[in-house]
C-alpha cells in the first residue's frame, strides 16, 4: 500500500522547487496525494478495513493543513499545485 522508493523519488523530482528540496509543501502534498490515491484503490477491495481508513483520514487532514498553509503563504503556488495534482479546488 505504501509508495515504493522509486515512486517517491519520481514524485519528489517532479514537484521539488530546488535540487535538494524534499520537504517543501508542494512535495509533501504531492506525496500525500499519491498515498491517498493508492489507498482509495485498496478500499474498493477491502471495504471493512477501518484501521487503514483511519490512516487515510489522517493523510487527508494533513494534506488539507498543508494546502491551507500554502494558500496563506503564496496563492500562485497553491493554485498551480492544485491544477497540477488535479484536485477539485
Curated annotation (Swiss-Prot):
One CC-aspect GO term: cytosolic small ribosomal subunit
This protein's UniProt keywords: Ribonucleoprotein, Ribosomal protein, RNA-binding, rRNA-binding
InterPro entries (alphabetical): Ribosomal_uS15, Ribosomal_uS15_bac-type, uS15_NS1_RNA-bd_sf
SMART domains referenced in this protein's UniProt entry, alphabetically: Ribosomal_S15
Function: One of the primary rRNA binding proteins, it binds directly to 16S rRNA where it helps nucleate assembly of the platform of the 30S subunit by binding and bridging several RNA helices of the 16S rRNA.
Quaternary data: Part of the 30S ribosomal subunit. Forms a bridge to the 50S subunit in the 70S ribosome, contacting the 23S rRNA.
The name this protein goes by in its record: Small ribosomal subunit protein uS15
Naturally occurring in which organism (per UniProt): Saccharophagus degradans (strain 2-40 / ATCC 43961 / DSM 17024)
Amino acid at each position: 500500500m505504501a509508495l515504493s522508493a522509486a515512486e517517491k523519488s519520481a514524485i519528489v523530482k517532479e514537484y521539488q522547487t530546488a535540487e535538494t528540496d524534499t520537504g517543501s509543501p508542494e512535495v509533501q502534498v504531492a506525496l500525500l496525494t499519491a498515498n491517498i490515491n493508492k489507498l482509495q484503490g485498496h478500499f474498493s477491495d477491502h471495504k471493512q478495513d477501518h484501521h487503514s481508513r483511519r490512516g487515510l483520514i489522517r493523510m487527508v487532514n494533513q494534506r488539507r493543513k498543508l494546502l491551507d498553509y500554502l494558500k496563506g503563504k503564496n496563492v500562485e503556488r497553491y493554485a498551480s499545485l492544485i491544477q497540477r495534482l488535479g484536485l477539485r479546488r
